[in-house]
């Protein structure tokens, strides 16, 4: 086998491979002999059919199959020989191989970029420092009360925090439009669910009032036929309601699975959950800054094949969130996912290089600690831990999480780290989706 390597644009490479004719003919003959030996032919005992007859019947198809297998096998031998690391499947050039002639073909593919990490000591990380205090717990308790609130009709004007039940009919240039009409529509004032100006027009109105308001649909409104249009709404207020919060008592506490200890036990449970959430938020914020810095300091070429693979993953995840239809996933435009897919690939390649350069391996104690920490969110942590320990795939997933965290720790160790005191709410509101 003869091999030459061409460097094309960017990460693209082309192998020119020549396979001696004898290798091809030997493989074709071996396959024809196998057919003659194992298939039945009319008029011949099994295994006694002439090879020339088999070649006449199956020779062309066998040759094509052999060429495909030979190209794949010799491509693998070539990349091993040349120490090349492909980032995706090769494209074999169309080839014709005449009997008795050498097989000459090309394989075009992308390779992984050569990554040389730099600038790790220039990465800046601001570590948030905070704690869950009593006022944070009280605020969370109030949030829980609001979630359990009921609504009661009041003889008061509509304002932020109250809920109204309204009938409305919308029109544009005197014509009603689809989706612009409703009866007994519940609207929580101040929630910002409606287009700009709609809630403002209702504020101050009381039960039984009928009136009209003029509004404009935003230019980026989801319905194409309504974008930027001026509309008039005829509205009737059927009732105004105020939120009634439940009493903070044992009955309220029992709704959250706290059987004993009353309000103080609920507060303790809420604090524990908030502290767990806080710990994860701090970890996420540090990780986010470390990865952002790593990407900013290390610009690399990205194989298109890897981006394509990641787009497929993101498409499938999107389809699962909306019913799991694979056909629908295929129809989603790649532009929706391209930027995120490229970011994921870049981060994966750079973290992979950190792991390689630091010679990191998943630490068993860290894996165990991660599983135990995750299990505390469940009613029976021991059952969750046992499930992981008995499931090798789940354990491998957790080992990957541990390895990524160890890579982040390695980046942090070389970065410029400072501390900043923030509140619980401020930290949680800063969170962004992980890369």
Swiss-Prot record:
Which EC number(s) does the record attach to this protein?
A: 5.2.1.8
The entry's free-text remark on domains says: Consists of 3 domains; the N-terminus binds the ribosome, the middle domain has PPIase activity, while the C-terminus has intrinsic chaperone activity on its own.
Protein's UniProt keywords contain Cell cycle = yes
An annotated GO cellular component of this protein is:
cytoplasm
Give the reactions, separated by semicolons, that this protein catalyses.
Answer: [protein]-peptidylproline (omega=180) = [protein]-peptidylproline (omega=0)
Q: Which GO molecular function terms does the record list?
A: peptidyl-prolyl cis-trans isomerase activity; protein folding chaperone; ribosome binding
Keywords, in A-Z order: Cell cycle, Cell division, Chaperone, Cytoplasm, Isomerase, Rotamase
Protein family (similarity comment): Belongs to the FKBP-type PPIase family. Tig subfamily.
Give the protein's recorded name: Trigger factor
Q: Which stretches make up the PPIase FKBP-type domain?
A: 161-246
Protein task: Involved in protein export. Acts as a chaperone by maintaining the newly synthesized protein in an open conformation. Functions as a peptidyl-prolyl cis-trans isomerase.
Annotated organism of origin: Vibrio campbellii (strain ATCC BAA-1116)
Q: Could you tell me which InterPro entries the record lists for this protein?
A: PPIase_dom_sf, PPIase_FKBP_dom, Trig_fac, Trigger_fac_C, Trigger_fac_C_sf, Trigger_fac_ribosome-bd_bac, Trigger_fac_ribosome-bd_sf, Trigger_fact/SurA_dom_sf
User: What is one Pfam family matched by this protein?
Assistant: Trigger_N
BP-aspect Gene Ontology terms: 'de novo' cotranslational protein folding; cell division; chaperone-mediated protein folding; protein transport; protein unfolding
* Cell compartments where the protein resides: Cytoplasm
Gene encoding this polypeptide?
tig
Q: State the source organism's domain of life.
A: Bacteria
């Amino acid at each position: 086998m003869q091999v030459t390597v061409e460097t094309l644009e960017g990460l693209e490479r082309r192998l020119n491979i020549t396979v001696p004719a004898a290798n091809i003919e030997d493989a074709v003959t071996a396959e024809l002999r196998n057919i003659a030996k194992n298939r039945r032919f009319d008029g011949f005992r099994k295994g006694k059919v002439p090879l020339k007859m088999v070649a006449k019947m199956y020779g062309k198809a066998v040759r094509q199959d052999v060429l495909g297998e030979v190209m794949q096998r010799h491509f693998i031998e070539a990349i091993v020989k040349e120490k090349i690391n492909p980032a995706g499947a090769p494209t074999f050039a169309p080839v014709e191989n005449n009997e008795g002639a050498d097989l000459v073909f090309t394989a075009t593919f992308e390779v992984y970029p050569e990554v040389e990490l730099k600038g790790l000591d220039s990465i800046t990380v601001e570590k948030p420092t905070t704690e869950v205090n009593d006022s944070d717990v009280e605020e969370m308790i109030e949030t829980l009360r609001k979630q359990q609130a009921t609504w009661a009709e009041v003889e008061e004007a509509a304002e932020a925090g109250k809920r109204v039940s309204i009938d409305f009919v919308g029109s544009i240039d005197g014509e009603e439009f689809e989706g612009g009409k409703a009866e007994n529509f519940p609207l929580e004032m101040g929630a910002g669910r409606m287009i700009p100006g709609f809630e403002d027009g209702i504020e101050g109105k009381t039960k039984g009032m009928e009136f009209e308001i003029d509004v404009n649909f935003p230019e980026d409104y989801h319905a194409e036929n309504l974008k930027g249009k001026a509309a008039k709404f005829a509205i009737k207020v059927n009732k105004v309601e105020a939120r009634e919060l439940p009493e903070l008592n044992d009955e309220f506490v029992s709704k959250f699975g706290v059987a004993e200890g009353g309000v103080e036990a609920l507060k303790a449970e809420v604090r524990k959950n908030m502290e767990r959430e806080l710990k994860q938020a701090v970890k996420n914020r540090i990780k986010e800054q470390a990865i952002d810095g790593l990407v900013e300091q290390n610009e690399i070429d990205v194989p298109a094949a890897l981006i394509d693979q990641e787009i497929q993953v993101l498409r499938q995840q999107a389809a699962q969130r909306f019913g799991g239809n694979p056909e629908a996933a295929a129809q989603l435009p790649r532009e929706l996912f391209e930027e995120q897919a490229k970011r994921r690939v870049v981060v994966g390649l750079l973290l992979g290089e950190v792991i390689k350069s630091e010679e990191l391996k998943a630490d068993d104690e860290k894996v165990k600690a991660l599983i135990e920490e995750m299990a505390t969110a469940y009613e029976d942590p021991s059952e969750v831990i046992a499930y992981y320990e008995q499931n090798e795939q789940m354990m491998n997933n957790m080992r990957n999480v541990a390895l990524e965290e160890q890579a982040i720790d390695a980046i942090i160790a070389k970065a410029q780290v400072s501390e900043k005191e923030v509140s619980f709410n401020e930290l949680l509101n800063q969170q962004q989706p992980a890369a």
